[in-house]
Amino acid sequence: MKPLKIIFAGTPDFAAQHLQALLNSHHQVIAVYTQPDKPAGRGKKLQASPVKQLAEQYNIPVYQPKSLRKEEAQAQFAQLQADVMVVVAYGLILPKAVLEMPRLGCLNVHGSILPRWRGAAPIQRAIWAGDKQTGVTIMQMDEGLDTGDMLHKVYCDITAEETSASLYHKLATLAPPALIDVLDELESGKFIAEKQEDSKSNYAEKLSKEEAKLDWSLSAAQLERNIRAFNPAPVAFLTVPVNEAEERIKVYRAEVLPHQNSAAGTVLAFDKKGLRIATAEGVLNIQQLQPSGKKPMSVQDFLNGRADWFVLGQVLN
């Protein structure tokens, strides 16, 4: 089969793993598009994206336009004369003119089984919603947000202990081989394009820091999923009044216990087994915490020197 000339567009590590798979294949990556370098770290030095760093190792031309809407950027893109563009977590909107330039269109790798979760945070929203299964969809891009025709789906289970970090790793392992399969057969017609059912779609909005605050009016099961969905970022948290200030404590692990008849947010117990807090339904037993400026730790370690932070019967906000 004839190698395809590919433009790759992506930014984070998840995208870099797909670029590596393309570089290991018989296809030819002729150019890479990625977000402009951004200030990072304490010194706020400009840092290249993982995709740019990888492309430079292979001496592949890198383009970093702030937008692809301008004529100059589009003319530059057209001159590359790619067979196909592959987009993985790029972060820029592609206008119709760009989508139509490659001979075989633009493919996108999306971290859910479409149309279930469209949008920026499908991995996190799937865990928070309690989905038992997810996967990746490789689709032909159109002007909509994750609305294009689907070419290939690969499924995986979401376990009861799954965090966004572990699921992200699973999908980053599953998706690149599936992408290569689609590219290998793109001209043969093996993968039949399937339309999405809009009525079955949900919008996976980016996680906000406001949502990360544990809301005791939800059930313990919902809060436990929240904790896993928000790990590794932005990390779920609770607040507790300490010396007339409000301490924010990050929460990394918890379990659901049967209900006790107490108001939501009531501190029921705290010992080496955990910090038990009443919710709208069931009890959340928090097992791993992180006070400000410290590393994540067990509740037993947390209570050493901080046992007075909680009072039995107090109701947390």
Swiss-Prot record:
Residues reported to bind (6S)-5,6,7,8-tetrahydrofolate: S112, I113, L114, P115
Keyword Protein biosynthesis assigned: yes
Keywords associated with the record: Protein biosynthesis, Transferase
UniProt family annotation: Belongs to the Fmt family.
Molecular functions per Gene Ontology: methionyl-tRNA formyltransferase activity
The keyword Protein biosynthesis is assigned to this record: yes
Function: Attaches a formyl group to the free amino group of methionyl-tRNA(fMet). The formyl group appears to play a dual role in the initiator identity of N-formylmethionyl-tRNA by promoting its recognition by IF2 and preventing the misappropriation of this tRNA by the elongation apparatus.
Name of the featured protein: Methionyl-tRNA formyltransferase
One GO term describing the cellular component: cytosol
Stored NCBIfam families: fmt
Classification via PROSITE patterns: GART (PS00373)
Gene: fmt
CDD domains reported for this sequence: FMT_core_Met-tRNA-FMT_N, Met_tRNA_FMT_C
EC annotation from Swiss-Prot or TrEMBL: 2.1.2.9
Catalytic activity: L-methionyl-tRNA(fMet) + (6R)-10-formyltetrahydrofolate = N-formyl-L-methionyl-tRNA(fMet) + (6S)-5,6,7,8-tetrahydrofolate + H(+)
UniProt organism field: Mannheimia succiniciproducens (strain KCTC 0769BP / MBEL55E)
Gene3D superfamilies cross-referenced by the UniProt entry: Formyl transferase, C-terminal domain, Formyl transferase, N-terminal domain
